[in-house]
């Protein structure tokens, strides 16, 4: 009941804020899950006024509570009605608000799978689309989950889908790409034993970027431990691997949840995923000297929020393994997929494999 009360209080606060700008009848909020989606869909189709929709997933990355694994997946559906162009002075057509019984709502969702195959194609954010990474003149490719765009004809879709991965303003031959012919033996699970460990935290409220230099031996495992804040909507994402220093522009960051990892004959990197701290985990004590004082102060784990919205306090881990000597720029960012320019914290790991 506390979770329901907390959620209702937050929704009321949002509605109060919106009422200063526009008629509060413009917006409606619903939690959609497996039990009530049909009822909400019927109400939407019965409506007479055009609307825009924003879908925000509940937190499925920041919680390690095993008891949540059996609960339904839910999303927050934000509906904004559009005023009629025929009568600018008229109000929004009433009678089509999406209403649902509070008993049908499930306020805590189960965790997203760490496997990319379990991410549904319809988890898209209504923001700008992305163009493709530029390709290297090599047999390596970065296999990133395709960004959704609307194309009128199926033929256009077939021609363009190959070029739709992630928008980038990087220069040509700057981005590594993963080939479909790469042997799966180079793929990592993210559960490998750490040879070195680096913690990335010290999150700022303003957009920033930082470059950290690391060296690895061929075959050595580097674990990147990523810390976040609870319930802020921010997520850690692996954005790309580059051979030249990339130019970072948060406006070009993906607006869709991505879980695909990168692997090639040269270097393999996993997407960040949550992990439980093991007392016998060697990464807790190895190479602690590479942490900054600010990062060491953030060792204590933040409290978990009562309602787990997108973004969580639990640590995420990404694993890096170099297979051949070389120099690579590995780009991670802590940002909101539905608002990439709002305080994105980008960390670039400059790795020398020797």
Swiss-Prot record:
It comes from the Eukaryota. Keywords: Cytoplasmic vesicle, Host cytoplasm, Protease inhibitor, Secreted, Signal, Thiol protease inhibitor. Its main location: secreted. It is found in: Secreted; Cytoplasmic vesicle, Secretory vesicle, Microneme; Cytoplasmic vesicle, Secretory vesicle; Host cytoplasm. SUPFAM superfamilies: ICP-like. Residues 1-21 form the signal peptide. Disruption phenotype: No effect on parasite virulence or blood asexual growth. In the mosquito vector, ookinete formation and subsequent transformation and growth during sporogony are normal. However, hemocoel sporozoites have impaired gliding motility resulting in the failure to invade salivary glands. In the mouse host, hemocoel sporozoites fail to infect hepatocytes. Residues 274-317 are annotated as: Disordered. One of its GO terms (cellular component) is extracellular region. Belongs to the protease inhibitor I71 family. Cysteine protease inhibitor. Required for the invasion of host erythrocytes by merozoites. In the mosquito vector, essential for the gliding motility of hemocoel sporozoites and, therefore, for salivary gland invasion and the subsequent transmission from the mosquito to the mammalian host. Required for the invasion of host hepatocytes. During the liver stage, may prevent host hepatocyte cell death likely by inhibiting host cysteine proteases. This is Falstatin. It comes from Plasmodium berghei (strain Anka).
